[in-house]
């Protein structure tokens, strides 16, 4: 054998030493007349060529619906190498697998254009990895035993009937604040609600309020919800291609203030209030997102 990087033959051991042979895995016997060499083989990858690996669900997979997915592959991507991913899922109506792969970024949420599902049938979900390398010495690596996908189903519908009732309602997506009791002497006459939200075309955000005067003999639970008016950015929608286009929305009671009539008595102030936000959408993949809620009780 030649010395690495030269045309000179290896003529001898450059370092003084002995070869130790293991005996019964406990003692070592030296041999002064022998040495140990290794032959190391490596793969020779084709530069800039592509290789594909396709992963499918097994037949015992629980059925799930998906409006948003995130693939989580365990992979090693070294410098000058790359892995790109695509997915196929099953159509909700036709129960057939998508024809083409949709490009996704690993460990990043991807909002589907329409709801999809993974069924109990093997192959109702596919993820395809495309591996490339700019070096003949190295390749990206995928751990096939730790390749997973997270699916998120949005629970939302497009009805708002019975939402003014004291309790219940037909909308699925609702958020109700806890009951707020103002300090003695700080009774309010009006409410102002501010939301920072994404509202795509086809989706709506409705804000309701419920108030109770300290002089009212009814209980808070008996009071009905009242729909508020949107007073800024009315009917405006966020762009459909981004999840960062938030709108500043403001809501206030429909009348001059939040006074109400109960048992023929008009109450001009209130001590207790709560807010209910009702979200609806014609598509489960285009849902409102709210990241900030501010409620101001005005005297």
Region spans (language model):
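Extracytoplasmic/surface-exposed domains of secreted proteins
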Residues: 1-2
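Beta-strand-rich ligand- or partner-binding modules
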Residues: 9-299
